[in-house]
Amino acid sequence: MATINDNYLKLKAGYLFPEIARRVKTFAEANPDAKIIKLGIGDVTEPLPEACRTAMIKAIEDMGDRGTFKGYGPEQGYEWLREKIATHDFQARNCDVDASEIFVSDGAKCDTGNILDIFGKNNKIAVTDPVYPVYVDTNVMAGHTGEVNDKGEYEGLVYLPINAENNFIAEIPSQKVDIIYLCFPNNPTGATATKDYLKNWVDYAKANGSIIFFDAAYEAFITDSSLPHSIYEIEGARDCAIEFRSFSKNAGFTGTRCALTVVPKTLTAKASDGSDVELWKLWNRRQSTKFNGVSYIVQRGAEAVYSEAGKAQVQALISFYLENAQIICDKLKGAGFEVYGGVNAPYIWLKTPHNLSSWDFFDKLLQTANVVGTPGSGFGAAGEGYFRISAFNSRENVLEAMKRITSQFHL
C-alpha cells in the first residue's frame, strides 16, 4: 500500500496566506457591496516595465521563426542573462560572483525550499521569529523538525526572536547551528542589516562550519548607500553563504516568474564520511535533474531589466512602492500607531492597538475598514501582537486604505 510523507501532517493547519484568502472570501460573500483593499500578501500591482514587455514580445516573435526558435534551454539559465546579473547586481558592488555561479529559476520561494534537497536531515536549523513561513514549512516537509508545540514552534528548530527591544535584529546564537536563514531587508518586519552586523554572522558561520541562506529578495528597495545589498559584500561570505534573489518585487515579475540563486564554487559542506563536498556541484546536479529552466521569453524580459531603459523603469517602480510605504508610515504614525519598517523596505510592521491579538486585529480591520493586512502571528509566535501591511498596491488604494484605517483607529 502506498504511504505518504508523514512530515506533512506536522504542518499547522493552513499556510498563512491561503487562510487569509479564506477569511476574506467568507467576508466578501457575506458583504458583497464591500470594497475590499488588499494590503496583505506582497503581490505587486503595477504593470511590467515597458522595456521588459518589449523584450518579451520580441522573444515571442523569435519563437515563431525556425531560425530563432528556442526549445529546451540550459537548466542554469541562458548565459547572456547570467552574465548581465553577475555584472550589474554583483560585480558592480565589488562582489566576487561569477556568472557560472548564478542559477536562474522561477522563484526565490521555490529555491529557498528546494535548496534543502542537497543538505542532510541532521542539520540544526536557525530561523528568526517572526519569519517568512516558507523557511519553516519547507523544513517541516523535509523532516528536519519534530512536532509543533503549544507556542506554535517546531521542536528541533532554533528560533531567534526579533522584536522592538532588539530593533528586529537577531542576536548571534550562543549554541552551534548548521544552517541560518537571514532575510534583509526583512520580511515581515522591514528591518535592515549593516555590513558590521552581517560580518558577525559570516564570522560565526565560518567558525562553526555553518551555511547562511541569505534571502535578498527586497535588496532593490535599499536607498541607504551604507547598507549592503548582498551577503557577498562581506569578506569571507563566499565560503559560508548562498544568496537568493528575485525579479518579482523590483521588476513586477510575480506573475511572470524569474529569480536566481548564487552558489559559490568555493562553498563546501561535509559528507557523512567527513569529506568536503562542493555545494555548487550538488545544486547543479539537482537543478539539471529536477528543473528544465525558465522560459526563453521570460529570461529575455529579465535581461531587459539591465538595459538603460529597464533600469530607469524598474527604479520608477521601486520609488512608487517606497512612496506608498512612506504614506502608510506617516498616516499610521499620525493616528498613534507604533510603526516599524517601511524605510529601505516595502513592508510596514506595526503593533496592534489595544492589545488585540494579531488575528483579532485582522478581523476588526477587515470588518470595520474593509482593509486586509497580514497577522504578525502568522510569521511566528514572536509576531503575536504585530501586523504587516504591504506597500504593494495602487496609490489610490493606499490613500483610501489609510483614510479608512485612521478613521476607525485613532489612538
From Swiss-Prot:
GO molecular function: L,L-diaminopimelate aminotransferase activity; pyridoxal phosphate binding
Signal peptide coordinates: none
Reactions the enzyme catalyzes: (2S,6S)-2,6-diaminopimelate + 2-oxoglutarate = (S)-2,3,4,5-tetrahydrodipicolinate + L-glutamate + H2O + H(+)
Binding site for substrate: 15, 42, 109, 132, 187, 292, 388
Binding-site residues, pyridoxal 5'-phosphate: 72, 108-109, 132, 187, 218, 246-248, 257, 292
Pfam families recorded: Aminotran_1_2
Entry EC number(s): 2.6.1.83
N6-(pyridoxal phosphate)lysine modifications at: 249
Any single GO BP term: lysine biosynthetic process via diaminopimelate, diaminopimelate-aminotransferase pathway
Biological function: Involved in the synthesis of meso-diaminopimelate (m-DAP or DL-DAP), required for both lysine and peptidoglycan biosynthesis. Catalyzes the direct conversion of tetrahydrodipicolinate to LL-diaminopimelate.
Protein name: LL-diaminopimelate aminotransferase
Species name: Rippkaea orientalis (strain PCC 8801 / RF-1)
